[in-house]
Swiss-Prot record:
Sugar-modified residues: 33
Function of the protein: Promotes spermatogenesis and ovulation by stimulating the testes and ovaries to synthesize steroids.
Chief localization: secreted
Annotated InterPro entries: Cystine-knot_cytokine, Glyco_hormone_CN, Gonadotropin_bsu, Gonadotropin_bsu_CS
Alphabetical list of CDD domains matching this protein: GHB_like
Name of the featured protein: Lutropin subunit beta
GO cellular component: cytoplasm; extracellular space
Coiled coil (residue ranges): none
Disulfide bonds: 29-77, 43-92, 54-108, 58-110, 113-120
Location of the protein in the cell: Secreted
Source species: Phodopus sungorus
Similarity-based family: Belongs to the glycoprotein hormones subunit beta family.
Length: 128
């Protein structure tokens, strides 16, 4: 009976979640301008540069009632299309690569958070 109640609640709320996610005031998942810093321990200077990153709202759902169903994956705003650009760190000694590459968001989408390329906010098993 509890499973049926949870399913019924989900079916009732799903259309309102879809409707609410199409509202004109919500911050969409989209590329936005950002200023980042680049550094290398072997180089004396840290520089800042501008790029575009993915940011904004992705519709999500959290179950209020305990359910026997598995947890619902929460989508995040992530890269859909991107290219890489580079900046040169000044003053690096010979033998040290002065180039730092970074992603530039061309388009974004709501999708699963991939631990292989993103910081998803939880514990990591390996460094990026």
């Amino acid at each position: 009976m509890e499973r049926l109640q949870g399913l019924l609640l989900w079916l009732l709320l799903s259309p309102s979640v879809v409707w609410a996610s199409r509202g004109p005031l919500r911050p969409l998942c989209r590329p936005v301008n950002a200023t980042l810093a680049a550094e290398n321990e072997a180089c004396p200077v840290c520089i800042t540069f501008s790029t575009s990153i993915c940011a904004g709202y992705c519709p999500s759902m959290v179950r209020v009632l305990p359910a026997a169903l598995p947890p619902v994956p929460q989508p995040v705003c992530t890269y859909h299309e991107l290219h890489f650009a580079s900046v040169r760190l000044p003053g690096c000694p010979p033998g040290v690569d002065p180039m730092v590459s970074f992603p530039v968001a061309l388009s974004c989408r709501c999708g699963p958070c991939r631990l292989s390329t993103s910081d998803c906010g939880g514990p990591r098993t390996q460094p990026m």
